[in-house]
Amino acid sequence: MCIRDSFSYSYTALNIDNLAFVVALGIDSSDSKEIKVTFQFVTPPSSNEGSSQETQIFEDTVDTNSIPNAINIMNSYLARKIDLSHCRNIVFSEEIAKNGISNFIYTLMNDNQVRPTSNIIVSTCSANEYIKNSIPSLETSITRYYDIFPSSGKYTGYVSDATIGKFYNALVCNACEPYTILGGVTSSTQTGSQSTVPDDSNIKSGASPISGLRSTENIGIGVFKHDKLVGELDAIETVCFHILQNNLSSFLVSIPDYNNSNSKIDLILSPKNTV
């Protein structure tokens, strides 16, 4: 009887219906506390309700002094245990990143639920706004979208495959400097705002001419000196970064037309095929 009861309790404690699955975590500055933490959740279909139930996405935010405190408060608020094992995106606002994020990185990496492969993003808008606007336009699963969007850098060069694990490794390396994905909300979604970037190759997140169902974008790289954000690379600068890293399978560049000073020629460059 004792053995049966212990197994029954273990199953109940770890049952999917007792967990709150976080797919994105955002960290902003707070007016009242140290930080404002945004959790983006998915509610998977209940095993009792069949597979036809749609997955729902929602966000909750808490002002607190640390990430562990935020998790503890949210555990109480939701009456479920926060689970970070499915967290795909970790987002910092520019303001937080400029002040240093090493303490947050160490805290998250010490949590055995956090995947080292989680994307790490610095947002030109607030992390809360970035997460709330991250609605996949083609994918039916938001986790699928979070998994695949960095891979577009292989054929565009405009986004990097930056993860919290790589960021941590660069922090503890004396000869390395960390970097992140540069995210943001398209300028066209802001009332009366338009992109003022004169050249397509100089666009970056928060200053691009893109408009569509999903207002978030990921173009460029956030550059760090140790744990502080010190600069941002635009599209063509990110392409150059990938060329140096040998991370590209193909990319497009525009060069001036020698015969027409008002025109440019688009070239798609790819490695030479070997026989």
Describe the predicted segments one by one.
Residues 4-275:
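Membrane-proximal alpha-helical signals and transmembrane carboxylates
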